[in-house]
Regions:
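Short acidic-glycine-tyrosine-enriched beta hairpin
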Residues: 114-131
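Short, conserved beta-strand element in jelly-roll/cupin
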Residues: 83-85, 95-110
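N-terminal leader/capping segments at the start of a protein or of a new domain
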Residues: 1-56
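Conserved short histidine dyad/triad with adjacent acidic residue
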Residues: 32-34, 61-65, 77-96, 129-133
């Protein structure tokens, strides 16, 4: 197992499936990888998977983690783990994408451009539809 993530939380297990030459389901890869701090120092990220197109080409053998992806991937999809540190927040921002935020641990506050706020706790899901927003961890625990 890998070291702790830069956030102090455990590393992330990733399991990827695919098909063998006979078309039968197989495990293509499995790894345990820690999140790593981003330059701003307010969160640590781990890219899990990307696709170049939607719908995805499941015959593409590229490891989706190895694609060059920014916060979004035009015409494709991106999934990443974000660990937001206690007392930290992102800048107000907007992406031309639909983002699905699933709170696995802790809690996060979502603030919209008009100052409206919602706190989402463990097990909660945010469907972020391209609005101007910021993320804030008001707790004393890391939020994943």
């Amino acid at each position: 197992m890998s070291d702790l993530s830069d956030s102090g939380l455990p590393p992330v297990q990733r399991v990827v499936t695919g098909h063998d030459a006979n078309g039968r389901a197989i495990f293509k890869s499995g790894d345990v990888t820690p999140t790593r701090m981003i330059p701003s120092g307010d969160a640590s990220f781990l890219l899990i998977w990307t696709t170049e197109t939607v719908p995805a080409d499941n015959n593409d053998e590229t490891d989706g983690r190895l694609r060059d992806a920014g916060l979004t991937l035009n015409q494709g999809s991106v999934i990443r783990i974000v660990d937001m540190l206690p007392g930290k927040q992102s800048p107000m921002h907007r992406t031309n994408s639909i983002d699905y935020g699933i709170v696995l641990d802790g809690e996060i506050e979502l603030e919209l451009e008009d100052g409206a706020k919602k706190t989402v706790r463990q097990g909660g899901i945010i469907i972020q539809r391209g609005t101007n927003h910021l993320w804030r961890n008001t707790s004393n625990r890391v939020c994943r």
